[in-house]
Design a protein with these regions (language model features):
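GST-like fold's C-terminal all-alpha helical module
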Residues: 96-194
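Phosphate-coordinating loops and pocket residues in cytosolic domains that bind phosphorylated ligands
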Residues: 44, 192, 201
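GST-like domain detector, emphasizing the conserved glutathione-binding G-site
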Residues: 1-126, 226
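Short, flexible loop/turn segments with low-complexity composition
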Residues: 83-84, 198-207
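Active-site-flanking alpha-helical
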Residues: 72, 165-166, 199-200
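Acidic/histidine-enriched, glycine/proline-rich intrinsically disordered or flexible terminal extensions
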Residues: 203-227
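A local structural micro-motif
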Residues: 27-29, 178, 198-199
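Nucleotide phosphate-binding site architecture
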Residues: 68, 170, 197
């Protein structure tokens, strides 16, 4: 049976959510941060030491996008991916790649800059903040064109890949989404999905919903206080 290792309050939420959307059988293993980063149990499974990690027979795999692709095609009969024949195929592959190729790294860079003690008025910090603002406008504009989901009328894995950065990741770096009305409407639609609700119940029941404009409370500061 497929086993999914989820570190609470992390991007591995994508994999739990995906499995719930696909309604497939899987074994969920939950891990807590120790206190801020991956626990030894994750490092013992996967030498990179990051979540998610999935196991399927002799296979052990990390990387969100790889895990999503593997599960969709090995266990989900291709559901939540669009085939090349679909008219919105290009949108699907674009937003799927944009999520971890551009959007999430932009937030990660700003997290690193802040952790290094660089003031937000620093030219480099301002330049990277400007990049993130541009990317958020890009997502907001894309949602304005498609009106429902990133790849059009169908919910896809591109949405699953993107939502983490627009929600949970905001607890590690403050992002105010008040100016992005299409994103906010989109997030309200996301949390109505039974699959998303089921993921939260099983994987992160204590995590607040982060679908409003103002930046949520900083979870990283809570973790630091416990370190």
């Amino acid at each position: 049976m497929l086993t999914v290792h989820h570190m609470r309050v992390s991007q591995s939420e994508r994999i739990v959510w995906l499995c719930e959307e696909l309604e497939i059988k899987y074994d969920l293993k939950l891990h807590n941060r120790d206190p801020m980063f991956s626990p030894q149990a994750i490092k013992d499974l996967y030498e990179i030491g990051s979540a998610p990690v999935i196991q399927d027979g002799d296979l052990t795999m990390g990387e969100s996008a790889a895990c999503v692709e593997y599960i969709i095609h090995k266990h989900g009969d291709g559901r939540l991916a669009l085939p090349p024949s679909h008219p919105n195929y290009a949108d699907y592959v674009y937003w799927f790649a944009f999520s971890n190729g551009t959007l999430q790294p932009a937030v990660s860079r700003l997290m690193s800059i802040k952790a290094a003690g660089v003031d937000s008025s620093n030219d480099t910090a301002k330049r990277y903040q400007g990049k993130l603002d541009l990317y958020l406008r890009h997502v907001d504009g894309g949602l304005g064109r498609t009106s429902k989901w990133l790849a059009g009328e169908e919910f896809t894995a591109a949405d699953i890949m993107t939502v983490f950065t627009l929600t949970t990741m905001r607890t590690f770096y403050s992002i105010d989404l008040s100016a992005y009305s299409n994103i906010l409407t989109y997030l309200k639609r996301v949390v109505q999905r039974p699959g998303y609700q089921s993921y939260r119940e099983k994987g992160d029941p204590e995590l607040p919903l982060m679908i409003d404009g103002p930046a949520p409370e900083n979870f990283l500061e809570k973790l630091k206080s416990k370190a």
